[in-house]
Design a protein with these regions (language model features):
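Alpha/beta-hydrolase active-site loop
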Residues: 61, 93-113
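Primarily recognizes the serine-hydrolase "nucleophile elbow" in alpha/beta-hydrolase
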Residues: 105-115, 119-174
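Short, surface-exposed "cap/lid" segments of acyl-processing enzymes
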Residues: 29-68
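Conserved alpha/beta-hydrolase "acid-adjacent" motif
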Residues: 245-251
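Accessory cap/linker subdomain of secreted extracellular hydrolases
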Residues: 147-219, 226
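Catalytic active-site module of serine/aspartate enzymes centered on a nucleophile-bearing elbow/loop
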Residues: 271-275, 279-314
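N-terminal cap/lid segment of alpha/beta-hydrolase-fold proteins
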Residues: 1-37
Length: 314
């Protein structure tokens, strides 16, 4: 996994006994952002590093966001998740609320950087990162704004149920025919898996020989971001893709209804959960091919504009 990119330098910070490693990328002096503007970048779910890269799928989402922000004059901090890359700890043993506290520590570290105006800091989250960004924004009216990309406005259990239906609908007909022949239904299999996870008590468990972050799953299933969305008083940019089958666009529309601050909603046609363009049917089966493409300039430009517009700082 890549840990740095052009123009950035390593930065470490602590949360309790854990040391998290990241990259601080200064904004270009030629950018249009007000002096001292900065953003904390929080990646999505899974064992991903500061660039949003996992061993099985390198999406480089946050690396590309950081580069676009830097060009606009916005500094940023992105970091490896606990137990991933150069960060200490055990990824599988960490819960959702551990990840939230790690992000809170990252926000404090960013505000402490030289040249960063503590009152001109944004939080930008993608997928799980959007859930985390919601929690930070709900508790911090000092933020200049928050960006929620592929966010959620329902419990994790509801989101996963929607995902199961969407994935089943995206399968080729021969596969769905075979599943019916074998009397296997994806939604039913999902329910059984969730029941097993709910019955667990440890931080980690194995399901079909695969190590699973059970505590994170239990916390995610029960977590409802709605009360925190209602508590947000800072400007919000919520972005969704019409081809996202992991975070349905209706969640972003609901975010607009719940958040108390100034909210901008953007739905990008044919954008997937990986923030790539997909002209064909929405499916996770093309993720590896999608990851070879760059993140859509549309979403990068929306984020950069939001972070450099004076109205977002009021």
């Amino acid at each position: 996994m890549t840990t740095t990119s052009s123009g950035g330098h390593p930065l470490t910070f602590t949360n309790g006994e854990h040391t998290l490693a990241g990259t601080f990328q200064p904004g270009a002096a030629t950018g249009t952002a007000p002096p001292g503007t900065a953003a904390l970048l929080v990646s999505g779910s899974g064992p991903v590093d500061r660039n949003s890269d996992a061993k099985q799928l390198a999406t480089a989402v946050m690396a590309q966001v950081a580069e676009r922000l830097a060009a606009a004059g916005v500094s940023s901090l992105r970091y490896d998740k606990r137990g991933v890359g150069e960060s200490t700890g055990d990824f599988h043993a960490a819960g959702l609320y551990d990840n939230i506290e790690d992000a809170r520590a990252a926000l404090a570290a960013l505000r402490a950087q030289g040249g960063v105006d503590p009152d001109r800091v944004f939080v930008i989250g993608h997928s799980e990162g959007a859930i985390i960004a919601t929690e930070l924004a709900a508790a911090d009216d000092r933020l200049a704004g928050v960006v929620l990309v592929a966010g959620s406005a329902a419990t994790g259990e509801q989101v996963l149920r929607e995902q199961a239906v969407a994935v089943a609908e995206s399968l080729p007909r021969p596969v769905t025919w075979l599943l019916r022949l074998l009397r296997k239904d994806i939604a039913t299999l999902q329910e059984k898996r969730l029941a097993t996870l709910r019955a667990s008590t440890g931080d980690v468990m194995r399901m079909q020989l695969v190590k699973v972050n059970a505590r994170w799953m239990r916390e995610f299933l029960d977590h409802d971001p709605s009360p925190s969305l209602e508590a947000i008083r800072v400007p919000v940019l919520a972005v969704a893709g019409t081809k996202d089958i992991q975070a349905a666009p209706h969640h972003t529309e609901r975010i607009g209804e719940l958040a108390a601050g100034l909210v901008t909603i953007e739905l990008i046609q044919d954008m997937t959960h990986l923030l790539r363009h997909e002209p064909g049917p929405a499916t996770v089966r093309t993720y590896k091919q999608q990851a070879k493409q760059p993140v859509l300039p549309d979403v990068l430009d929306l984020i950069a504009t939001f972070c450099t517009t004076p109205a977002a700082h009021t």
